A protein has these predicted regions:
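P-loop (Walker A) phosphate-binding loop of NTP-binding proteins
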Residues: 98
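ATP-binding Walker
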Residues: 101
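Hydrophobic anchor at the beta1->P-loop junction of P-loop NTPases
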Residues: 95
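A glycine- and Lys/Arg-enriched "phosphate-lid" helix/loop adjacent to the NTP-binding pocket
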Residues: 183-226
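ATP-dependent small-molecule kinase phosphotransfer cores
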Residues: 120-170, 175-178, 206
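Domain-level signature for soluble enzymes in the chorismate/prephenate branch of the shikimate pathway
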Residues: 1-90
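NTP-dependent small-molecule kinase module
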Residues: 109, 113, 227-261
Length: 261
């Protein structure tokens, strides 16, 4: 055996060690999730990720290949998050609510803590059409836009473990709600009209309220939609006075209770 073969054999032994360690680590991730659930502990603990990064930074101080090792550990953390997400949710999480209720914010937070894919319906539709939502409304009309929403929801039936952030009007169509529930749990995020106005006042891609950014108008439109929103929802979460972590922890907790019934 020449020197190159010896080195390659040593490399293969390293790979065996890494593989065994990864299998063990993934098993431990599942055990941690089970322990948290069994003992009623908080599922989301983002501070733990910060501790892991600090530990790695200290261990790699002054060593070669620091960036490459950091990339590997980032991949390991991402896959650990996905293992947690699949253990918690074997379905899509469908976020509905009035514009400005926090759907995009919560989608981003879930993506960060669980490495879940996010489908922002308005964003996807705008990208595919090559124009803003306002321009779609103006050029083709609301009916055309609503049909695009329905088709996208149908498309999502082939996927799972995805966060789907719906436009404010999406749940108003009964056929859309049917599609949401085929492979998802529907979470309604709510907020007071005053909160909604504060969140959307500087956004100009909201055609339904662009010329009516007032609390009374928003309150009236929210009331008109309330019954259908609530009928579509599996759970309802108020977002006023809560940060992203509190909202997502409540979301996870209540979905788990629902799944256990």
């Amino acid at each position: 055996m020449n020197q190159l073969e010896i080195l390659r054999e040593s490399l293969g032994q390293c790979d065996e060690i890494i593989l065994d360690a990864l299998i063990m680590r993934n098993r431990i991730v599942e055990d941690i999730m089970a322990y948290k659930e069994a003992n009623g502990l908080q599922i989301l603990q983002p501070e733990q990720e910060a501790k892991q990064k600090e530990w790695l930074e200290n261990r790699m101080e002054g060593r070669r290949h620091k960036d490459e090792v950091a990339d590997v550990f980032e991949c390991i953390r991402t896959n650990s998050k996905r293992i947690q997400a699949r253990k918690l949710f074997n379905y899509n999480i469908v976020l509905i609510g009035f514009m400005g209720a926090g759907k995009s914010t919560i989608s981003d937070f879930l993506k960060n803590v669980f490495a879940m894919d996010v489908v922002e319906m308005d964003q996807i539709i705008a990208q595919r059409q090559g124009m803003s939502i306002s321009d779609i409304f103006e050029t083709y009309g609301e009916q055309y836009f609503r049909d695009l929403e329905t088709n996208l929801l149908i498309e999502m039936q082939s996927r799972s473990n995805v966060v789907i952030s719906c436009g404010g009007g999406t749940p108003m169509r009964e056929c859309n709600v049917v599609e949401m529930k085929k492979n998802g749990r529907v979470v309604l995020l709510t907020a007071k009209p005053e909160t909604i106005l504060d969140r959307v006042k500087d956004n100009h891609d909201r055609p339904l309220i662009e010329n009516n950014k007032t609390v009374p108008f928003i309150a009236d439109l929210m009331e008109k939609r309330r019954a259908k929103y609530e009928a579509a929802a599996d759970i309802i979460i108020e977002t006023d006075g809560k940060n992203e972590l509190e909202i997502c922890e409540e979301l996870v907790h209540r979905l788990r209770i629902m799944d256990e019934k």
